[in-house]
């Protein structure tokens, strides 16, 4: 497996999804969203932008999560968590991903501080795709929140 550089603050956020068909989901995250496979099999690790998507066939419980069963969303219209992808140009991404087969719920819609739209992956996981439109907003990495509590106590 290729190695991503270690995160500067010692942490990186990875999104873990459960799929009924790991290969189908791999194709979606690589061919439609443009990620690249870093580890094949089950799970599949896909590098996407500056993070990882881990695609797993589900299962459980396991010794470290003895009461947890991993499964796909039973109802894709009832969501408690979703992936949020921030982009520089939402209209360009919408056109590109639509051409690659992404099925958006709606075209991008303007909201007070962002323009956004949503897609679902093949298992029904919701994905927000958005662009900040706040003229005062700076979403560059220099303005991301710190990932360590130690800095707050200094």
Residue ranges and their predicted role:
Residues 128-129:
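Short glycine-/small-residue motifs
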Residues 1-13, 36-85, 92-120, 132-154:
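Vicinal oxygen chelate
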Residues 25-30, 97, 121-124:
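Conserved active-site tyrosine of GNAT-family acetyltransferases
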Residues 24-25, 89, 93:
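Short phosphate-engaging motifs
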Residues 19, 84-87:
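Short, solvent-exposed loop/helix junctions and linker helices
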Residues 16-22:
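Conserved beta-strand-loop-alpha-helix junction that forms the acyl-donor binding cleft
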């Amino acid at each position: 497996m290729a190695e991503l550089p270690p995160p500067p603050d010692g942490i990186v956020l990875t999104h873990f999804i459960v799929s009924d068909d790991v290969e189908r989901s791999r194709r979606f995250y690589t061919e439609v969203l443009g990620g690249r496979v870093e580890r094949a099999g089950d799970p599949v690790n896909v590098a996407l932008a500056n993070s990882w998507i881990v695609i797993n066939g589900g299962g459980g419980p396991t010794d470290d999560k003895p009461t947890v069963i991993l499964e796909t969303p039973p109802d894709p219209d009832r969501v408690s968590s979703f992936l949020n992808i921030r982009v520089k140009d939402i209209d360009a991404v919408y056109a590109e991903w639509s051409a690659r087969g992404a099925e958006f719920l709606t075209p991008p819609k303007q909201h007070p501080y962002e323009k956004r739209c949503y897609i679902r992956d093949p298992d029904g996981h919701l994905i927000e795709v958005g662009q900040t439109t706040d003229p005062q907003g700076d979403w560059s990495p220099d303005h991301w929140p710190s990932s360590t509590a130690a800095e707050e106590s200094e």
